[in-house]
Amino acid sequence: MLRKLTVLFMCLTLCWTTVACGSSNTTSYQNSNPNISSNPIKQNRNQVTQGQYPVQQATYNDANGEYTLMLLNTPAGTPPMYSTTDLQMASLTEEEIQEGKTNYTEINGNQASLHIKPDFKIEYVHNVTETQTDPQTGRQETIIVRRESNFWTPFAGAIAGQVVGGAISNMLFRPQYYVPPVYQPGGVMTGYGGYGNSYDQAVNRYQERYQAPPAAVKNRQTLRATGVTNSTRSNNTR
């Protein structure tokens, strides 16, 4: 009897070990083959996750393609800042502006759409990078050496450019993804470098136009996680 119980116990142990190993192999395979996107969505850290809110100001950072919006009329005790890399934009129509509609955002979790007047300025934070050799490892790394700042108006002058046969295209008035044009210091940047129904489509159109990826896409791939140097903090340029 004891011998039978021993054999049974060994069989059960072998089966359990086989299942556990199979489960471990599956997990390892999934982790080693993550889905890669040109616009990875960060885990939601915003306390505002739903609703429509007026927007006081907006900032775009080309280190990672992240937008930060300052909202108005958020619930009491809720921080007014909302950050996302998944932002669509649309221009307010002339009718909406005449009716007194202000700049606003529609938020749904990590995704949001920003509806703005043609003269709305988004602060553009540009990260100037250099490739340097790490003295400890001897490997080359791309780091941020300073930041510059300008303003970007995606739809300024764009409506006139969309007139075809006397009719204004409705493309600008429905939410789409937009990629900023190549960063330029000095005067306000206008228009956009690429657009599309998806972020990847906007990136592709940008690359067709400039024969290079947008700064945010390039920086996400090359920047060192700890690549903010002392000069970055002290040499901001506006």
Regions found by a protein language model. Give the residues of each.
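Low-complexity, glycine/proline/serine-enriched intrinsically disordered segments
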Residues: 22-238
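Hydrophobic helical h-region of N-terminal Sec-dependent signal peptides
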Residues: 7-15
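Positively charged n-region of N-terminal signal peptides that target proteins for export
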Residues: 1-4
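C-terminal motif of bacterial Sec signal peptides marking the signal peptidase cleavage site
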Residues: 16-20
